């Protein structure tokens, strides 16, 4: 199964770093948060990734084009015009980088990569700025079992997100503000049937608005409830928090060796 990751946003609340790189390339523990997200999927057997590039997308392309340089020790034999890579660290990934426009909204970016998932039974979809100790395989199994078009991961918020109205596992509506403590939110990790892309009109469509709301109204949106760790990296404070967890060896999303 393929995983589509949005990686084209500006990241204005992390402007100290995103002035020179896209938000998914902001580092946690010396590696881009995009890498952390891909490792989260990879540990569950996901090897095919489609990255929706936009703002400063060339930075992402350069990273993967020179992956050995970023991940390994190297010796440059200058007179021989040769590079020797030591202790190669390679991932079993197939990474497709797609330019989805500098100003496209989240739905527009997904629509632009439709050709890469159109023949699949289902695919995974997430944002390039959040991590969780999520059981990816369990979300896939849940999606296959209920037979609806879309599954989102419902989680508990740090405190500033709109809430979901979930009844018997089905998302009935979105609410601008939580009803109170205990309300779950859209955690941004999806399992989708390709047909949901038909609900996206154009580049200006926001995935979290019309498409998701329509799926909820049609009874085609189910919630996989994740009570564990979940944390987006929206602000510098979020980055510092995640960096601290990583440095202390207490990063809950690190389920790989």
From Swiss-Prot:
EC number, as in UniProt: 2.7.7.33
**Entry cofactor note text?**
Binds 1 Mg(2+) ion per subunit.
Judged by the first EC level, this protein's enzyme class is transferase
Q: Which GO terms describe its molecular function?
A: glucose-1-phosphate cytidylyltransferase activity; metal ion binding; nucleotide binding
**InterPro entries given in the database record:** G1P_cyt_trans, G1P_cyt_trans-like, NTP_transferase_dom, Nucleotide-diphossugar_trans
Q: Where does Mg(2+) bind?
A: 129, 234
Alphabetized CDD domains for the sequence: G1P_cytidylyltransferase
Enumerate the cofactors the protein uses: Mg(2+)
Q: Where does substrate bind?
A: 6-13, 23, 104, 109, 128
Q: What chemistry does it catalyse, as a reaction equation?
A: alpha-D-glucose 1-phosphate + CTP + H(+) = CDP-D-glucose + diphosphate
Pfam families recorded for this chain? NTP_transferase
User: Would the keyword Nucleus turn up in this protein's UniProt record?
Assistant: no
The entry's keywords: Lipopolysaccharide biosynthesis, Magnesium, Metal-binding, Nucleotide-binding, Nucleotidyltransferase, Transferase
Q: Which pathway does the protein contribute to?
A: Nucleotide-sugar biosynthesis; CDP-3,6-dideoxy-D-mannose biosynthesis; CDP-3,6-dideoxy-D-mannose from CTP and alpha-D-glucose 1-phosphate: step 1/5; Bacterial outer membrane biogenesis; LPS O-antigen biosynthesis
User: Which GO biological process categories is it annotated with?
Assistant: O antigen biosynthetic process
- Family label: Belongs to the glucose-1-phosphate cytidylyltransferase family.
Q: How does it assemble?
A: Homohexamer.
General function of this protein: Involved in the biosynthesis of the tyvelose, a 3,6-dideoxyhexose found in the O-antigen of the surface lipopolysaccharides. It catalyzes the transfer of a CMP moiety from CTP to glucose 1-phosphate.
- Add the further remark from the entry: Catalysis proceeds via a sequential rather than a ping-pong bi-bi reaction mechanism.
Q: What is this protein called?
A: Glucose-1-phosphate cytidylyltransferase
Q: Give the originating organism.
A: Salmonella typhimurium (strain LT2 / SGSC1412 / ATCC 700720)
Lineage start: Bacteria, Pseudomonadati, Pseudomonadota, Gammaproteobacteria, Enterobacterales
């Amino acid at each position: 199964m393929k995983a589509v990751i949005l990686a084209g946003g500006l990241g204005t609340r992390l402007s100290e770093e995103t002035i020179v790189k896209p938000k998914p390339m902001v580092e946690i523990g010396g590696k881009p948060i995009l890498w952390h997200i891909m490792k989260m999927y990879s540990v569950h057997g996901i090897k095919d990734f489609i990255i929706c590039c936009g703002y400063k997308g060339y930075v992402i392309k350069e990273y993967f084009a020179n992956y050995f340089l970023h991940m390994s020790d190297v010796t440059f034999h200058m007179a021989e015009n040769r590079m020797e890579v030591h202790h190669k660290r390679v991932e079993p990934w197939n990474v497709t980088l797609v330019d989805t426009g500098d100003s496209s909204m989240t739905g527009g970016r997904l629509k632009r990569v439709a050709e890469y998932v159109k023949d699949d039974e289902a695919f995974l979809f997430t944002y390039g700025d959040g991590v969780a100790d999520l059981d990816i395989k369990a979300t896939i199994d849940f999606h296959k079992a209920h037979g609806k078009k879309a599954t989102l991961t419902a989680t508990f918020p740090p405190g500033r997100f709109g809430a979901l109205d979930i009844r018997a596992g089905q998302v009935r509506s979105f609410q601008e503000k939580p009803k109170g403590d205990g309300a779950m939110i859209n955690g941004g990790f999806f399992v989708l049937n390709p047909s949901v892309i038909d609900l996206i009109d154009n580049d200006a469509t926001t995935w979290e608005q019309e498409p998701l709301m329509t799926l909820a109204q049609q009874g085609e949106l189910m919630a996989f409830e994740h009570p564990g760790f979940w944390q987006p990296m929206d602000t510098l404070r979020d980055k510092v928090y995640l960096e601290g967890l990583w440095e202390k060896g207490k990063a809950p999303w690190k389920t790989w060796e």
